């Protein structure tokens, strides 16, 4: 992400969501905001989530998401816009929803970020 004249430009944002095992739906996993996150890390974390859920006998597949952003460098409003954009991309690709993929917090995210995700999903899908 880059900031230009107080506008957040998302063209350069790297956003990821990996679903490791869709054998048992929905899949479940956290959403991480970190400046150095990449697709390989997200895929590895999704795989680990599958194993964690299996060990705990939770009947979900594993998933993990990531947004490449250093939250210390952006305002709350900018982080909100990035979160809502990420959520819209997940909706477009059917990577979010109670029957498909249950997102949760992880490093760099919190209750507020999860609320923005929920609100965006609810406003678009009406669920």
Regions found by a protein language model. Give the residues of each.
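N-terminal ligand-binding/catalytic initiation module
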Residues: 1-127
């Amino acid at each position: 992400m880059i900031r230009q004249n107080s506008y957040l430009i998302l063209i350069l944002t790297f956003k990821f969501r990996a679903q490791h095992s869709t054998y048992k739906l929905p899949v479940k996993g956290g959403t991480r905001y970190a400046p150095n996150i990449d697709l390989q890390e997200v895929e590895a974390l999704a795989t680990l989530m599958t194993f964690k859920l299996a060990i705990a006998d939770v009947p979900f597949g594993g998933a993990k998401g990531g947004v490449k952003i250093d939250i210390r460098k952006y305002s709350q409003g900018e982080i909100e816009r990035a979160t809502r954009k990420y959520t819209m991309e997940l909706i477009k690709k059917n990577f979010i929803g109670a029957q498909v993929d249950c997102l949760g917090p992880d490093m760099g995210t919190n209750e507020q970020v999860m609320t923005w995700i929920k609100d965006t999903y609810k406003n678009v899908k009406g669920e």
